[in-house]
Amino acid sequence: VDLTPLPSSKLSRREREEYVLRFYAYLYNYQSFVKSVQKFLKESIELIENDFTGNEARLREILFSTFNFVNRNFKSGFKRNNTVSIVSRVRYEAISVGCALAIQQNPLIADKTNVNTNWAFEDEFLSMIRSDASNSKPKVIARIEYVRDKILEAT
């Protein structure tokens, strides 16, 4: 909850649950993303539900290990800085899924601390996630894999 602060108006619309859905949808299916986020999420729900049955512990561990890693290594969590009160969806998706992919590729990363994540506050990454960043398939893939590769390089 601390990593994804949301105003009460968004909480009442169940946006926290949507962030969890976005995490799993992009983690397992980001390369299939086309253009419409809502359509992508809707199509991903069925895939996630099928995978969730019998795998609850593993899926929960992926989420928790990713969030713990972000909490330890990103000075502002998913936020751009500590003065911002909410987390942008695009930033959240890129960082959460990119970190999870890196952890899946190298599970030893999950327990690392003091990983250099300064790149998350530099122009190259910020331009990938700015408010007018497109949700085109190449851009979604590029920002998720950028985070994954930066985490793998830094560990």
Q: Predicted segment positions?
A:
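Flexible coil/loop and intrinsically disordered segments
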Residues: 1-155
